[in-house]
From Swiss-Prot:
The gene is thrS. It catalyses: tRNA(Thr) + L-threonine + ATP = L-threonyl-tRNA(Thr) + AMP + diphosphate + H(+). This is Threonine--tRNA ligase. GO terms for molecular function: ATP binding; metal ion binding; threonine-tRNA ligase activity; tRNA binding. It is found in: Cytoplasm. It comes from the Bacteria. Belongs to the class-II aminoacyl-tRNA synthetase family. The lineage of its organism: Bacteria, Pseudomonadati, Spirochaetota, Spirochaetia, Spirochaetales. Zn(2+) binds at C276, H327, H457.
């Protein structure tokens, strides 16, 4: 497998069918079970149930055993289209299915799938028969709670997660990846490296510790340097903005449920979930000419979104975060060159973080059925994105009809060291937000008439917090030298050499490196072990010989030790940092 997150339709179908087999097994083992929904998801599937009694992970082997028993029947998956009346009668004892049926449009086809003794309301597709499901190619993973339809006012259901693969060896490979992913979990490593913590009483908000904040600022300053080189102007917009702005932008109608809302002086305000309306407001200040375009406004924008507590995950999914956000205001003629420029910037930045071109996937989302603008405009916009990818040497897969209603977009996904995929960067064309119907941004064209600019929404990293989580897991906490919050620790072999260790620290500090002299009372071996656990890449051991020769014994993270003069180590580390070297050796 090229990546463990298999996207093929065939594998998704297999997983969906395995979910049905699991549902049949659960119904067999727990009579009276009410079944809800059971889709295929990334890496596997799940099914939600209302069970007659609580179950836990100890029950999973029995369910797996029943599933394998069902598979021996080699039953076919048979589709049948039925009337609404028949569906309501068939599922009269299944309240969740009845609710789904009643919620379907009057003209929508209602289909069921039969397999063995189990019948489910389902659109499909499915494999032909249970013989297509390898009895050793699936595993039930865990049990969790899930509110019906994600609504905390509705019943809490039991969700059983599983994974399914075409071959047992694929399953084995996936489970090995999960084991390695557990070791690389950013929450575990973040704690070991003393980077951050999250308070149980304040979920979704990060407390950055000194080392973690150093890492954060290193990334932020790197991005700031790159975008300045690329002609962006950095701005800052208010964290709290009035309801009237969100209504005009369209976010109030489409995004209100995800916004934190407050009231002051009988007016409603919202903590911003995104930065785009604020950037349009900046563009609108003063008269703009076509000569001012393209105008590139960038912001490390603090955003807050009211994410359900159950969806929060470390620093990967949080409520308060900062985006490396930017919006480019340009003419239609400038779209292609601006997107090309952005793609080149994105490739360079990803490479510096250790993601080469073959670790970048690009999805090109084209016009949806419901959209604004005429076909000629969409033709030009889509061609501009396609040409930009070609200019940057980026191959893409087309996602037909998945563009936003206001314009097509490119989405950039990174493949990490375990083959997992993380969607990070994006660039979207927007004809709607600057329009007269929304925020009415205008410039004076070369014809002396007013025009609305095209707006390009773009980000490279996305959420800085989430990207840091991705980096931690990608490199197992062992950051490249330029990123490491602590680039070197000086460890004296005995207290007699503390003064020399502090001298080395001062010299390295003056050169701009992030170093610590560990002159604590622990024994040398304990110090070395501690800094190894904290993922420090260079430990500089100093004793009598090093002090006499103005040198350091450089203990490499991957093993081995090399004596260098202090000047040699400075040159060595400077070269690693300046070249954005990924390998510390």
């Amino acid at each position: 497998m090229s990546t463990l997150q298999e996207k093929s339709k065939k594998l998704g179908t297999l997983r969906h069918s395995t979910a049905h087999v699991m549902a049949e097994a659960v119904v067999n083992l727990f009579p009276g079970t009410k079944v809800a929904i059971g889709p295929a998801i990334d890496y596997g599937f799940y099914y939600d149930f209302e069970l007659p009694r609580p179950i836990n992970n100890d029950d999973l082997p029995a369910i797996e055993k029943e599933m394998r028993k069902i598979l021996t029947t080699r039953s076919n998956f048979e589709k049948e289209v039925i009337s609404r009346e028949k569906a309501l009668e068939m599922f009269k004892d299944q309240p969740f299915k009845i609710e789904l049926i009643k919620g379907l449009p009057a003209d929508e086809e209602i289909s069921i799938y039969k397999s063995g003794e189990f019948t489910d309301l389902c659109r499909g597709p499915h494999v032909c028969s249970m013989a297509d499901i390898n009895a050793q190619g699936f595993k039930l993973m865990k049990i969790a709670g899930a509110y019906w339809r994600g609504d905390e006012t509705r019943p809490m259901l039991t969700r059983i997660y599983g994974t399914a693969w075409e071959k047992p060896n694929d399953l084995k490979e996936y489970l090995a990846m999960l084991e390695e992913a557990e070791k690389r979990d950013h929450r575990r490593i973040g704690k070991a490296m003393n980077l951050f913590h999250i308070d149980e009483e304040n979920p979704g908000q990060i407390f950055w510790h000194p080392k973690g904040w150093t890492l954060y600022l290193t990334i932020q300053n790197y991005v700031r340097k790159r975008i300045k080189e690329d002609g962006y102007l950095e701005v800052h917009t208010p964290f709290v903005m009035p309801r009237s702005l969100w209504e005009r932008s369209g976010h109030w109608a489409k995004y209100k449920e995800n916004m934190f809302i407050t009231e002051s002086e009988k007016r409603l305000f919202a903590l911003k979930p995104m930065n785009c309306p604020g950037h349009v407001e900046i563009f609108k200040q003063g008269i703009k000419s076509y000569k001012d375009l393209p105008l590139r406004l960038a912001e490390f924008g603090s955003c807050t979104r009211n994410e359900p507590s159950g969806s929060l995950h470390g620093i990967m999914r949080i409520r308060g975060f900062v985006q490396d956000d930017a919006h480019i205001f340009c003419t239609e003629e400038q779209i292609s060159s601006e997107v090309s420029k952005f793609c080149a910037l994105l490739k360079r930045m990803y490479a510096d973080f250790g993601f080469a071109e073959d670790k970048i996937l690009v999805k090109f989302s084209t016009r949806p059925e419901q959209r604004v603008g005429d076909d000629a405009t969409w033709d030009r916009a889509e061609k501009a994105l396609s040409d930009a990818c070609a200019d940057a040497g980026l191959k893409y897969e087309i996602a037909e009809g998945e563009g936003a209603f206001y314009g097509p977009k490119l989405e950039f996904t990174l493949i990490d060291a375990l083959g997992r995929e993380w969607q990070c960067g994006t660039i979207q064309l927007d004809y709607q937000l600057p329009s007269a119907e929304r925020l009415n941004a205008e410039y004076i064209g070369d014809d002396n008439n007013k025009h609305h600019p095209v707006m390009l929404h773009r980000a490279v990293l996305g959420s800085l917090e989430r990207f840091i989580g991705i980096l931690i897991e990608n490199c197992a906490g062992i950051m490249p030298p330029w990123l490491a919050p602590v680039q070197a620790v000086i460890v004296p072999v005995a207290p007699a050499f503390n003064e020399y260790a502090q001298k080395v620290q001062k010299v390295l500090d003056e050169k701009g490196f992030r170093v610590i002299a560990d002159i604590g009372t622990d024994r040398m071996n304990a110090k070395i072990r501690k800094h190894q656990e904290e993922k420090v890449i260079y430990q500089l051991i100093v004793g009598q010989s090093e002090m006499d020769n103005n040198s350091v014994a450089v203990r490499m993270r991957k093993g081995g030790q090399k004596v260098m003069t202090l000047d040699e180590f400075i040159s060595f580390l400077k070269d690693k940092v300046d070249s954005f070297a990924i390998d510390s050796e």
